[in-house]
Amino acid sequence: MIKYFGILITIFVFSCNAPKKNSLSENNLEMAQSFLDNIITNPEKAKSLLHKDFTFAWMGIIEQGGKIWNKENLFDEYFKNIIPEILPNGIVLKTLDAISDDNGVAIIQEGDAVGKNGEYDNKYVWVFKMKDGLIHSIREYNSDILVATQLYNYKLINTEK
């Protein structure tokens, strides 16, 4: 009996010390955050997290809105040419909250930047869908009004008389 008790205690101790495995939901969240953390500073790392059929779209209704970008042109054109033109001094993004499950992630962020036309402190929601253990798609949501006025120099006009 004492022999069996010793075996049970040994099994219990080793099972308590086993490294915790992350759930698929936690892995998805880590991958999405890693992508956002590396898109400018380490684009090759960010790109390595993307599925071969990856798509990205900013969901605004003005310039660039709804355009579908792929794994190649997202980095070669969008992040290399378009973003530096409208955010010449870059942007600091702070994650406020996140939701994840086995199929995807939503990350809520607040930005701190000066756009080419003035202060640009937008709020963001990034919706990630996962496939085959990689990021399959990202949709970016934020304020069209701030994008239009502070990045593209649109003027707001009061149409009520």
Stretch-by-stretch model annotation:
Residues 2, 11-12, 16-44, 48, ...:
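Short, low-complexity N-terminal intrinsically disordered segments enriched in polar/charged residues
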Residues 32-35, 45-47, 54, 74-75, ...:
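Hydrophobic pocket/interface hotspot
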Residues 52-101:
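A solvent-exposed, acidic/Ser-Thr-rich amphipathic alpha-helical stretch
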Residues 68, 117-120, 147-152:
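A short, polar/proline- and glycine-enriched secondary-structure boundary/capping micro-motif
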Residues 93-98, 111-112, 123-128:
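Hydrophobic/aromatic beta-strand elements that line small-molecule binding cavities or substrate pockets
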Residues 102-111:
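A short hydrophobic beta-strand element
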Residues 113-115, 132:
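Beta-strand elements of well-folded, non-transmembrane domains
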Residues 139-161:
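Low-complexity, intrinsically disordered terminal/linker segments enriched in charged
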